[in-house]
Amino acid sequence: MLHCQHEIPLHIVYDEEAYVAKITWIKKRDGRVETYRAEKIAAAVRGAFGDAGEVPQEGTLEQVVELVEAALAEAAPASAPAESRAVSVEDIQDEVERALMRLGSFETAKRYILYRHRRTELREVRSELAGAVAEDPQGAAALEAELLRVERDFPEPVYAVSHLATRYHALTAPGQTADARMSALIRAAVELTSQEAPRWEMIAGRLLSLRFHRALAARRASLGVESFSRLVAYLTNEGLYGSYILDAYTPEELEKAAACIDPARNDLFTYAGLDLLLQRYVIRSHAGEPLESPQEMFLGIALHLAMNEGRSERLAWVERFYDMLSRLEVTMATPTMSNARKPDHQLSSCFIDTVPDSLIGIYRSIDNFAQVSKYGGGMGMYLGKVRATGGSIRGFEGVAGGVIRWIRVINDTAVAVDQLGMRQGAVAVYLDAWHRDLPEFLQLRTNNGDDRMKAHDVFPAVCYPDLFWRMAEESLDQDWYLMCPHDILAIKGYALEDSYGEEWERRYLDCVADPRIPKRAVLLKDLVRLILKSAAETGTPFAFMRDTVNRVNPNPRAGVIYCSNLCTEIAQNTSAIEEVSQEVVTSEGDTVVVTTTRPGDFVVCNLASLSLGRLAVEDDTEMGRVIETAVRALDNVIDLNFYALPYAKLTNHRYRSIGLGVSGYHHMLAWRGIAWESEEHLSFANEVFERIAFHAIAASERLAEERGAYELFEGSDWQTGAYFAKRGYVDGADAGAGVAPAAG
């Protein structure tokens, strides 16, 4: 096959006076007139020589081009009007054949003739397929142009449009609508996707993009929306965009921002990725019709994230945020992608609440979860303080229902509060490995047993102390003692869950030795068997190593880390919300009940993910640029966020925690041919993640210099330098050197 995109060597020079003045335009097969480019002839001829297994002698390409131009110039005298000197593609190709034969390159001429024949066949397949799918000439022309792009970008025989046509005809029947036919064409591309031909998924994505953008253009034309600034105004009037965007940016600024949009980046989507984005994330009318394109979605998010930047540099940050998103280098958290630019702009993904051991506190935590879920957040809930089954209530022994009953209420809340039908609520429930309800907890999602003790829509997670695994390693035939946290607090005067490490072990063994505390002895091997059985059947429980996490807590003076979030990725101090008082107050003739609460630490984390498969991870400068942009966007989320709960806002501003994760890890390795089970993998991963950590911390430090350190910086491991010492990043001489990050 010829490769017409190649350029001829720069030393080839044409006599402009003799030829170019006479051949100025070329008429394409679809009637379009383009500027004549002699180098395209040379590139096609070079390709023909290559197909024939020959290398053209020096000067041959120039001779062919000169012969072609001379013949064409003779056919169109210089005195003729410019439009009549526009020669057709077919005329040029005919003259190329004659020129090759005049020069004695018969095998090359034969290859060139075969090439023309193949191109004719491909054109016929494209034209026939486009005509069969589309309902009007404009639609057929647009589809044929897209199929031509597919041929050029995917030249391998396995991606021939003829394969698509064959599969399409097998999926269609007479009488189908144009939309159904286009759906069948997209489905045909999806079904052609295989291990041997994986890029059909990219082709399917392009076809889906074509259908979506044509429908969107028609819809917008009917609404009279012709520019991005008018689109923002229309969406704002409809209550689909937050008015804060128009308050922050002038129409002129919006149009300048819109100039950043690069439609070519739609080609980066796979079918599955684009379909998900169109279904979940682009703004739709109240009737469910899409009103913005994927690139406009990325720009809208960028505009929101850059709102509070200084006016002189704000649009520059808009462009940087747009670039990292539209190039798919960084993916913001689902709520940010979904809610940024909208009236209810809850941008954070993950929240953690500590459930207190009181009826009011438990229901407050469940209500908190409902509010978080309503706006797209996921939740981690620590139930380690809730008394176990058979515990006492107000001195009455054996009446407590335990944590399972409350988890079932949490489960039903997750199902009921489904984020406007977008997706079911998501929650992880955490319990300590020494809690008396642990055996039942481990069977929450298994398929056998009493269904009244099941909760299939939550994600159980266990908080393990080091002692548990140390004893398991020593001997699985030892007893492990399960206890009720309420009993321990009532008898010993301390909450066992409030400690970790050596202090926890000392207290745990003290409780085991105290005969006043009821205990449930379970063989370690039976407990481990339950854990493995549940993991094999359900993929849960998640594992959270509390001692390890608390040892490296950068804010140890501010509290204890009880658990993590839905994804087991956040490690941050948590504490329960406490009710202080409730009083009846009469003011100006209106009687109200005022409840006063102490907020505790209601953890919020603001997340983004580096797409390692799309980043040049070896390029330190490029990684630094992308990471700095992502960290700044995440820090902006904290201030721009809509908070459904005041507790969340207080904690988020106190700690300013951000989470920069990764995706596309296996993709990164596959691109580089790095085997999973290899030393090269380990050393490469270490290098990549050290680079990510370095640039993230450096970006946070620069933000602290610009905006100030977070509230709890004084006395933190960041301030003392212990953060780096605990991780082995400094020698003894540097252990006291601190850094002031914007986030804790």
Predicted regions located by residue number:
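Extended catalytic cores of very large enzyme megasubunits
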Residues: 2-4, 11-744
